[in-house]
Regions:
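Extended, solvent-exposed, turn-rich assembly/linker loops in the middle of proteins
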Residues: 44-114, 120
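Sequence/fold signature of self-assembling virion shell proteins
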Residues: 93-182
Length: 182
C-alpha cells in the first residue's frame, strides 16, 4: 500500500487556484508510482539468483552478453542506477552522430540494443537488471486509486489521503536477467 496525505487549512483549500491543487495531486501520483517502481524492482531482484558477472567495468560487450542471455524473451527494459546510466551513455558505441541529433531534436536517449533505460537513484550501482516487460512481472492491484477527504473542524484543517494498493509477482524467471560489474 502506497499513499500520501495532503493537509491544508480550510482557507487555503477554499481560496487556492485549481492549478495548484492539480500540480500537487500529480506530484503525489508521481511519489506513489516511484514507490511502486521500487516494489517492482524488489520483486524482480528476488527472482534472480545469479547472472552475468563482469570482472572489469561495464562494457558494451557485457551489455551484448546480457542481451544474448535472453532465451525466448526480448530485452525491452534496463533498470539502472544513475552512475551506470552515465557509463552506458558514455560508451563509444552509444556516441552515434545520427543518434545524437535525435537526442537533441526529441530528447530521446539512444539506448543499448533498443532497450528502454529506466534510471533511479535507489537502484544499486554496479547492477543492471534487464527484463522483458511483457512477461517478467504482474502487477496485482486491489481497486483503483482511493481518495479520502476528512475535515477536522476543531483544528480547521482539511486532509486528503490518496492511496493505491498494489503488489508485484514475477511471471517467468527467464524474462529477467542481471548483470553485475566491478
Amino acid at each position: 500500500k502506497r499513499g500520501r496525505m495532503l493537509v491544508a487549512s480550510y482557507e487555503a483549500v477554499k481560496f487556492q487556484k485549481l492549478d495548484l491543487f492539480t500540480v500537487t495531486l500529480r506530484q503525489i501520483g508521481n511519489c506513489i508510482a516511484e514507490g511502486q517502481l521500487l516494489d517492482a524492482y524488489a520483486a524482480l531482484i528476488g527472482v534472480h539468483d545469479s547472472g552475468i558477472t563482469l570482472e572489469g567495468g561495464l562494457t558494451y560487450a557485457g551489455l551484448v552478453d546480457l542481451w544474448n542471455a535472453f532465451e525466448g524473451f526480448n530485452m525491452t527494459t534496463l533498470l539502472v542506477s544513475a552512475r551506470d546510466t552515465a557509463s552506458i551513455l558514455k560508451m563509444t558505441e552509444m556516441q552515434d552522430a545520427i543518434a545524437g541529433n535525435d537526442f537533441h531534436a526529441t530528447g530521446r536517449v539512444v539506448t543499448p540494443l533498443g532497450a528502454e533505460l529506466i534510471k533511479h537513484k535507489m537502484f544499486p550501482d554496479n547492477t543492471i537488471l534487464a527484463l522483458d516487460r511483457t512477461c517478467a512481472l504482474e502487477k496485482v492491484q486491489a481497486g483503483d486509486v482511493v481518495t479520502d477527504f476528512d475535515k477536522l473542524i476543531d483544528r480547521q484543517l482539511e486532509r486528503a489521503s490518496i492511496t493505491a494498493i498494489a503488489g508485484f509477482s514475477p511471471i517467468f524467471s527467464g524474462a529477467v536477467q542481471m548483470l553485475t560489474h566491478a
